[in-house]
From Swiss-Prot:
Organism the protein comes from: Euglena gracilis
Alphabetically ordered keywords of this record: ATP synthesis, ATP-binding, CF(1), Chloroplast, Hydrogen ion transport, Ion transport, Membrane, Nucleotide-binding, Plastid, Thylakoid, Translocase, Transport
Main location: plastid
Protein's name according to its UniProt entry: ATP synthase subunit alpha, chloroplastic
Similarity annotation: Belongs to the ATPase alpha/beta chains family.
Amino acid sequence: MIRVRPNEVTRIIRQQVKKYRQELKIVNVGTVLQVGDGIARIYGLEKVMAGELVEFDEGTIGIALNLEADNVGAVLMGEATNLKEGASVKTTGKIAQIPVGRGFLGRVVDALARPIDGKGDIASFTTRLIESPAPGIVSRRSVHEPLQTGLIAIDAMIPIGRGQRELIIGDRQTGKTAVATDTILNQKGQGVICVYVAIGQKASSVSQIVTTLEKRGAMEYTIIVAENADSSATLQYLAPYTGAALAEYFMYNGKHTLVIYDDLSKQAQAYRQMSLLLRRPPGREAYPGDVFYLHSRLLERAAKLSDELGQGSMTALPIVETQAGDVSAYIPTNVISITDGQVFLSADIFNSGIRPAINVGISVSRVGSAAQIKAMKQVAGKLKLELAQFAELEAFSQFASDLDQATQNQLARGARLRELLKQPQASPLSVADQVATIYTGINGYLDDINLEDVRGFLIELREHINNEKPTFKEIINKTKTFTQEAELLLKFTIIDLKKNFKKRIK
């Protein structure tokens, strides 16, 4: 028979009483009234906040967007195939946030920063709100450093600065993504961290971009956020904010970042779908009334930070697709009014064989020469004017039968200047190469070379300077100025090379 020791029983009970902690947790619970098309209507969530995350009993997470008198409209993050009417929902007390950090470099993630490239989990010890407030006026300083794209047409005539927001706009299949990916490739060795956000793209297109960046060694400083065409509208809507949050981590740590949103038209369409399903009143083109705020709060997060905050920067290159070149549609006009300029890509120019197909007449940078080094300002000043005059003369010359010699010379010069702006995809040029190329065209050294030989001569010139005259590149990179020494060196190099080139052509 077991003997009961009262002292021991008392001691055990006392220990258990000491350990016991009474926790009273109040959970705000509701019931699903209706679910479908990525939207759930919930009854009973009386204390829910706007934008708060809610958790359904089968594990799906949603965001409470519509707070109405008798129900709450929530958008679902994911498929939620097992979610049914009558299921219980509880509030989490949290706003959507994601992990951020250096571990994301070289990875492909979704809108919730979960890896989708099959390379395992990402170690991260910091989180950021997906929707963070933009830096205030005092936190910023004016844009004054160039962000080189490697494309002559942009760096010379529509310069982009670190902290600027420059819209890339054009019809489908005019090379918008190519301009963006070339800009990423050109940041190699520049200390700029790039974030490419693919919204509603084909999975094959995103895969192609990843392959290009990996081949060129650009993935080591790039993060890709991808929500493909088959993703839910909620995740497509969140993807750009996730990209901005990932870039902000680096910006507030004193780094320079570049974010590409490809493209915001698809994000607006996803938001329109969500809003219509939530029964919000439609406005112009059936978009909701706050579609301007959708993009403004995203693009205002791009900034050049003040010295006190570490001088970091976030440059935004949003992409918007137009229909038949119509820039007066709702979304294009909204984004044009938010950004600091636009690069307009034309289908007609693209089809005429000029790539990148930038319409220099309509494109503009509101930062201007503040985002150029002195060397570029010195040579590129006349380029835009000469091209504008050429475009006018070219249109006029189609109607005129006999043109005087001066007009013919100007037309010949303009055709060669347009030729030097052509660049194959994925071959960005350094600043020194661009300065040499523009100087050659502006000063008439290409005038007596046949039009079809211009690109061949320029390629040869750039190779010759890089291999035989490294001093030129050193001067430009060190002083950022097109000095007299650099000009003389370049002039004699062009003259010598031209003689040999002409002999070979003959």
